[in-house]
């Protein structure tokens, strides 16, 4: 298989060149630095094992703990879904009647505040749905748009484990944190080390 050189901007090239010999480690081993677009307000506790979009991925990983990410509100992906009678997506309508959902219960959360499952109510009947949204961290806000059409909004994008891209942007822009401070915030107990000829041990997943 042949690979061609990736085309990128000079700014990106300089950024990569500046840190090319640095690695993020935990107890001497290179970490699996997972990340997602937006974590809502807290990242999830990361655990490995059976692949799941919920909080539990298997056994606990010490450097993937729930941490604060307070700048998400300004930078997160804000999504709105119309749930009026003309909305046809089955995940927001009762598949039996076609009627829009009337309410949602998202109180079933883990310690990081992430919804484990949600219960939607339509015509007095309750249905439990798991992992039917783009994010495992979301908050429902029922209301109407400018035209009076019922809408539901939620925030967060991705699995929410490890570094949040939106949160990292917020920490840099609002608090002046550098990349080392941001990485050490999101990866609990991790250290940035310089790569040497004595290679660091790699993690095994």
Model-derived segments and spans:
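Conserved, single-site charged/polar hotspot
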Residues: 1-202
């Amino acid at each position: 298989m042949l690979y061609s050189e990736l085309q990128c901007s000079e700014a990106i090239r300089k950024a990569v060149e500046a840190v090319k010999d640095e690695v993020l480690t935990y107890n001497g081993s290179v970490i699996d630095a997972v990340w997602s677009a937006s974590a809502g307000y807290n990242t999830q506790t990361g655990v490995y094992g059976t692949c799941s979009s919920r909080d539990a991925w298997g056994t606990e990983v010490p450097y993937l703990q729930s941490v604060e990410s307070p700048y998400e509100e300004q930078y997160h992906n804000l999504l709105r879904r119309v749930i009026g009678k003309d909305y046809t997506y089955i995940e927001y309508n009762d598949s039996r009647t076609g009627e829009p959902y009337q309410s949602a219960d998202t109180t079933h959360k883990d310690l990081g505040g992430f919804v484990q499952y949600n219960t939607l109510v339509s015509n007095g009947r309750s249905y439990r749905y798991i992992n039917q949204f783009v994010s495992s961290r979301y908050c429902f806000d029922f209301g109407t748009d400018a035209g009076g059409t019922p809408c539901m909004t939620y925030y967060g994008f991705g699995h929410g484990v490890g570094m949040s891209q939106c949160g990292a942007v917020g920490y840099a822009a609002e608090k002046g944190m550098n990349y080392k401070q941001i990485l050490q915030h999101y990866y609990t107990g991790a250290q940035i080390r310089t790569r040497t000829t004595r290679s660091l041990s790699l993690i095994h997943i």
